[in-house]
């Protein structure tokens, strides 16, 4: 392990998209993660996925997501209306949208203060765009005792994607996550190398967490 920092603190929210971590500011080779913030009703943000697949995780608020450029739909756009709606990430299962490479996406706020997590990774295939509703999320409880937690997996093997696997984990106060200790940075018979990014939020806001690597 090098002396590089493995902790990247979230920056103050500003309107639009803010990169938190990615290849340009860390040792990551593939994954980029950031936050999209639309403070007012009617605010919009548009971007192109280019050579990457993207997953939008609606942290809170209600929004529309429009997708253009998916080859199998020609000039016809795909519109997911009034999706999300959570008060915060602790208020139920997430809503996520999978975006393939080479499309344009537009997010429009339907309520004030829409916040979206944005995960990106290189992709070779233009898989179908996909809305994953809360009722489609796989929920399971893992661990025991003080390392028990609830895991929501939205983008798993049932969603066609090249690289991204995306979900949320809810930890009771004082419990550990990612336990038992493990790693996945070496290719062996029992281990496969892949990158992993955690984005932490706490409730109440003055709470704190500790991560040991």
Locate predicted features:
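Ligand-binding loop in jelly-roll beta-barrel domains
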Residues: 87-126
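Short, structured patches in soluble enzyme cores that scaffold and shape functional sites
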Residues: 101, 109-111, 118-122, 153-156, ...
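Long, compositionally biased, intrinsically disordered regions
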Residues: 3-5
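A short glycine-rich, His/Asp/Glu-containing loop-to-beta-strand
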Residues: 12-46, 53, 145-197
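Short acidic-glycine-tyrosine-enriched beta hairpin
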Residues: 45, 67-101
């Amino acid at each position: 392990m090098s002396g590089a920092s493995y902790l990247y603190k979230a920056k103050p929210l500003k309107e639009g998209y803010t990169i938190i971590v990615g290849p340009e500011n860390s040792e990551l080779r593939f994954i980029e993660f950031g936050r999209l913030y639309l403070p007012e009703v009617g605010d919009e943000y548009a971007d192109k996925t280019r050579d990457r697949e993207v997953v939008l995780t609606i942290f809170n608020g209600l929004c529309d997501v429009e997708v253009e450029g998916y080859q199998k739909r020609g000039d016809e756009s795909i519109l997911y209306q009034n999706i999300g709606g959570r008060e915060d990430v602790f208020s139920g299962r997430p809503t996520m949208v999978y975006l393939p490479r080479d499309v344009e996406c537009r997010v429009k706020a339907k309520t004030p203060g829409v916040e979206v997590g944005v995960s990106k990774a290189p992709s070779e295939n233009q898989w179908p765009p996909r809305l994953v509703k809360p009722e489609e999320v796989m929920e399971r409880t893992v661990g025991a005792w003080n390392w028990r937690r609830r895991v929501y997996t939205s983008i798993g093997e049932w969603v066609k994607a090249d690289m991204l696997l995306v979900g949320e984990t809810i930890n009771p106060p004082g419990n550990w996550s990612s336990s038992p200790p493990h790693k996945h940075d070496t290719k062996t018979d029992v281990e496969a190398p892949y990158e992993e990014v955690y984005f932490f939020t706490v409730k109440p806001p003055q709470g704190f967490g500790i991560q040991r690597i």
